[in-house]
Amino acid sequence: PVTVVAEEKGADLKQRIARNFGCPQPEGYRKSLRLMQQAEKFGRPIVCLVDTQGAFCGMEAEERGQGNAIADNLVAMASLTVPVVCIVLGEGGSGGALALAMGNRVAMQDHAVYSVLSPEGFASILWKDRTRAAEAAAVMKMSAREACDMGIIEEVVSEGDGPAHENPEQAAAYVEEFVTRSLRELYRLSPEELRDQRYERFRAF
């Protein structure tokens, strides 16, 4: 048995509205925390599928403790003694992504991005000019290859022949291979080694 925690945006407008465009509320992070604590209790490995532009940042989310919910996830994931494998599918934005990406192995799909905010937001803050988004993206180094080169992730996972949304079954097969292989490798470590390896991994950057 494996515990799977996933952020989902939806495939069309109706689904995206129902899923809050993939921006989790505090309750979503608390639900994921309960699942991870349950996995720890029963010794189940955890697989996190990350796809979000970031945690929902509305006033109501802040009033319900969005920052605390993200911080609680990070603290809990740092102390888990079961294998944790994470993969960014499409987009990993800010703390909303990091709250489910503190794993022993972290990967990104080939066309995915991982950053603290959008290039448009970066450009508007740094240069007061959203039209410089392409320049901002280059500075931010948010692509999968760049994240791998910097040691933020271990692996870039192929999406097959073209982007994942055009051939989801092929892309899913590559994700399955990465997750399965990573879990096999991590099962060789003791619970204490898993926790320590995860801590050292994130302290490195």
Residue ranges and their predicted role:
Residues 18, 53, 111, 196-199:
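Generic intrinsically disordered, low-complexity segments enriched for polar/acidic and small residues
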Residues 21, 29, 42, 56, ...:
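Aromatic side chains
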Residues 44, 50-180, 184, 188:
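Conserved catalytic cores of soluble enzyme domains
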